[in-house]
Amino acid sequence: MSTSKTKLSPIIAGTMNWGVWDKNLSVKEMNHLIHLCTENNITSFDHADIYGGYTTEAQFGKAFSESKIERSAIQLISKCGIQMVADNRSTTIKHYNYSKEHIIWSVENSLKNLHTDYLDVLLLHRPSPLMQADEIAEAISKLKTEGKIIDFGLSNFTSSQTELIRKNCAVQFNQIQFSATQLEPMLDGSLDYMQLHNIQPMSWNPLGTVFREDSEQTRRLKKLFAQLVTKYGVGSDTLLLAWVIRHPAQVLPVAGTVNIARIQQLMKAASLELSLEDWFAIWTESIGKNIP
């Protein structure tokens, strides 16, 4: 069980595709989407400073401000550390920066963009070979003391990298890539480690490659889902999320869809109980052979 102070929704809305990187939603459309998510009990929103080339946070913030939704009714997650080459930045090469000054500056900039006084969760976006654990801990301590972040976590960190950060700084979350087509975290000890240390996993790309690639693996899974959607009365996407949620590490899927009909169905995954054999059937079809 996570030691976090923040209670996140069982499904998290991922905003990476809301802006110019993909759907290019207007502020009005984002406003509508925020309302739609919260009306369907998806109250946690996953951001990163870099999304939309450093523009999506500000668009979301304006939409949220206009939505008139109470700040306490939602949870805002954001990430920092990746430095991208962009028109609105002086960066000359993509790199990672986890200096105390940069972490604090990034958080304060995200707060301004998101029209909020605090982040519910701050994540370090990707590990850097040059990160100094003590310096990171100082930044997080200062931000927590000032009430600018409530909880702290990581993203894409291995167990050993997490252990390094945990040395002087409590870690409540780690956002990793985990799905029915990306099985490594449940096989390499990552999810076991998080359970041992009360770190709650978030899963980005929780639908995996099922809808994005045509491969032997995805064809096997789609054939199985053709049977399971009838049995459970939900779509394949909901089944994929339910498979992720079934893991005892209490994984929180980050769903990036902006499809209205799909959003209205997503929360069914949180209450859907896949049978033991169906859960293993999905694993079996993913690897194309019986499990060991």
Predicted region positions:
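Short, well-ordered coil/turn segments that N-cap beta-strands
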Residues: 6-11, 41-44, 70-74, 116-120, ...
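Active-site groove signature of glycoside hydrolases
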Residues: 111-130
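Beta/alpha (TIM)-barrel catalytic core signal, keyed to glycine-rich beta->alpha loops juxtaposed to Asp/Glu
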Residues: 127-292
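Short catalytic-loop micro-motif centered on adjacent basic/acidic residues
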Residues: 44-51, 123, 150-153, 175-176
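N-terminal binding-site loop/beta-alpha segment at the start of enzyme catalytic domains
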Residues: 1-75, 117
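Alpha-helix N-cap and loop-to-helix initiation/capping positions
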Residues: 25-29, 55, 59, 94-102, ...
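Structural motif corresponding to the early beta-alpha repeats
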Residues: 71-98
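Short, acidic/polar
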Residues: 24-37, 98-114, 158-162
